[in-house]
Amino acid sequence: MPKGPKQQPPEPEWIGDGEGTSPADKVVKKGKKDKKTKKTFFEELAVEDKQAGEEEKLQKEKEQQQQQQQQKKKRDTRKGRRKKDVDDDDDGDERVLMERLKQLSVPASDEEDEVPVPVPRGRKKAKGGNVFEALIQDESEEEKEEEEEKPVLKPAKPEKNRINKAVAEEPPGLRNKKGKEEKSKGKAKNKPSATDSEGEDDEDMTKEKEPPRPGKDKDKKGAEQGSEEEKEEKEGEVKANDPYAHLSKKEKKKLKKQMDYERQVESLKAANAAENDFSVSQAEVSSRQAMLENASDIKLEKFSISAHGKELFVNADLYIVAGRRYGLVGPNGKGKTTLLKHIANRALSIPPNIDVLLCEQEVVADETPAVQAVLRADTKRLRLLEEEKRLQGQLEQGDDTAAEKLEKVYEELRATGAAAAEAKARRILAGLGFDPEMQNRPTQKFSGGWRMRVSLARALFMEPTLLMLDEPTNHLDLNAVIWLNNYLQGWRKTLLIVSHDQGFLDDVCTDIIHLDTQRLHYYRGNYMTFKKMYQQKQKELLKQYEKQEKKLKELKAGGKSTKQAEKQTKEVLTRKQQKCRRKNQDEESQDPPELLKRPREYTVRFTFPDPPPLSPPVLGLHGVTFGYEGQKPLFKNLDFGIDMDSRICIVGPNGVGKSTLLLLLTGKLTPTNGEMRKNHRLKIGFFNQQYAEQLHMEETPTEYLQRGFNLPYQDARKCLGRFGLESHAHTIQICKLSGGQKARVVFAELACREPDVLILDEPTNNLDIESIDALGEAINEYKGAVIVVSHDARLITETNCQLWVVEEQSVSQIDGDFDDYKREVLEALGEVMVNRPRD
């Protein structure tokens, strides 16, 4: 049988046979030979193994060289030599890149119009966009945002290297073909961005290089990997040297703001060491303010004050009219004292013709008698007296020209009231509690509180245009407060007072300045009038807030988002404001309207637990005589008792023994004769004027109550909160609390003791007005006995206390009310009581 045609062999034996495929990359079927080289499969394998071994050897040598280079660069970095080399290399690369970008860019005039220009056939079209000019323009911005750009650009670098790496590994023919296609695509673009231009430049530079020779691809790959490692190493060193590399953008901005504030504080320290913790800014003086520079009124607009990084005043306005008496009120710690200090130091723009005095420091302790310390405050009078003495000496020597000058000096002395100066000084000192012997006593023999009274007497004697008093009643007894209250009601110059004594503010002030929300708000009338107006204002604000919230709720129900609803509401407020502004064209522009916030009332409530009933008398002194060693007795034959419903206020001048009487009642002092008797079940709660001595300063308020009364943590915090201690202060060491906060801790301790009798020695010191009101309400609701020593007239009158006067070594009850006692005190000093009606 004839044989059929011979079967054709299968299709091409070579896999991947193409234009750019090297013989080494061809795959041969088992048992076949290459028609060109006539090599067997095993010979091909041997050749490949040999080439692979050589390449592996070269690769190892390259890696060793790279490791040596990296170690050398690390050593150079330690020695500080590497930075110069890197900068030189970077400068060279940057110059090459800039020259390349300059060739690709067009003039700036072409960049403005960007009208496409027809290109003649056969010519290349210039690339659009002036990349070089754009880089020059943004160079400073890129330097500023270098830290922010790094996280964005870092992932792009490996991608760029991968592109170059892929181009290097592609066959030469395919790479050239692909490069032509990419080049033609680049011509079709009119306005490439700076990033695209950089990419095209990298590709063009890659194309211009010679095609890689066999066996060089891996070398190039290794070199590129080495350069990539160097770049990553540089970035790692930058991050290691940058202490803020781990911070986010928000944290960096916050840190920058804090550093700016610290620099501002440092500059302020250099300028004025007295105000080293404060920052003040004030708007430029307007034309209206410039007109008032020579007037007696003060008008400061748009000033801001910050202390320790905390903003106290923001765009606030200060208006003070000559001859008015202002009371500055507001919660503790909001900047009232800071404002007084800035006015006194003229950190704010006070008119130069207004002399300002802030009474805040006690007089120097020296040999100067108290009355002379007051008289020497009037430097003009002292200068005239010295001139008088000098001219009298010249006149005695026969100088006739001195007579005319001496007459002028006498006229000035009469005009200033120099003859009555000493009588005036002694009257002021007597009103503040100095008897004739004390007025002639050297100041170094007085305590700090009495030297503070001398300082207050100096301020009253000088009568500045603007007198500022910061808590003037804190160092005074009730009698001195009564005299000062009456004296200031006749003050004819401008007065600015910070005080927590509501009765004092009601009697003295004609206007109230309320510090609220970092601004100053003004009310005509005394504190009682302000309180009514403020409460009415808060009610109106609450109604407006509820109306606003209702409108926002309706807008949200209609499909608006919260942001859209708030924006629409603000637009309505803006239109209303513009309408009002058109009606009142004379008024200055107001701040842009903001959405209302819920009004928050500052409320404090004190509570003391009611005691169980006890049979009277629960406490008393019987036949008691007491005196300190080496001194005459303070009391002789005291005999009185106290019941559970007693409300007693002990009054009298300083030094007569009011605090000593309280210590005898509590059993802390033992009588010289007689005895203190009390019910065996009686528990006494004592608030000492030196209350800080009974606290453990290293403990927190919560720990102090937990240890003393075995209270759970939450119960201790609730007790502290009831007496107005802020929650953040519950876990702070007591030594770091303010005086008012420490006082609240003591009141919380008294409540935990569940006393049957409250004995309070000057409890209103360091308390604000709201807390004093809360204390008065708590005393009225308390079912036990109360004995109090206080200089706060309103606390005395609000609690309906009986007045017991300490005088002449005994204690006696007054027939009449508090006004009767005031009249007696003023008559004893030779003063006439001012009966100014309260508004």
UniProtKB/Swiss-Prot annotation:
Name of encoding gene: Abcf1
Protein name: ATP-binding cassette sub-family F member 1
Role, per record: Required for efficient Cap- and IRES-mediated mRNA translation initiation. Not involved in the ribosome biogenesis.
Subcellular compartments: Cytoplasm; Nucleus, Nucleoplasm; Nucleus envelope
Binding site for ATP 2: 652-659
Xref: PROSITE patterns: ABC_TRANSPORTER_1 (PS00211), ABC_TRANSPORTER_2 (PS50893)
Keyword ATP-binding found: yes
Main location, first listed in the record: cytoplasm
Residues bearing the modification Phosphothreonine: 195
Swiss-Prot/TrEMBL GO biological process terms: positive regulation of translation; translation; translational initiation
GO molecular function, one term: ATP binding
Residue sites binding ATP 1 per the record: 330-337
Entry superkingdom: Eukaryota
Compositional bias of kind Acidic residues: 136-149
Modification sites for Phosphoserine: 22, 105, 109, 140, 197, 227, 589
